[in-house]
Amino acid sequence: MKLFVLILNRTEKLYDLMAAYAHAAICGATIIDSTGMARELYGAKHDEEEISFFGSIRKYLTDDMRKTSKTVLTVIREDQLDTIVRITEEIVGDFSQPDVGIMFSLPIDFARGKGLNK
């Protein structure tokens, strides 16, 4: 089994994404509101000299920019990884583009809960 993690910046795609996951028998996701590091630093108004990389990212940040992301966590079987990645890219878009999101998976050594013993 794997833990599939999606940090979704295009939050308007969340409903369609969850519906597509359910249609593909990928169920049981947990969705958490999240904020990226750059947004948090920008909102905190830190001294730019204090954080060396801040000056380089400042030009990409504006007050009307997306303030939150959604972090989606779901436990999947190994054979579902290609499916969930394909669905996510089809609905959300090209992850090599800025402000789309990040997705990755981690191996799970142990899991117990409803639906995890399949």
Language-model features: where?
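Positively charged, small/polar-rich N-terminal and surface patches that mediate targeting and assembly
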Residues: M1-K118
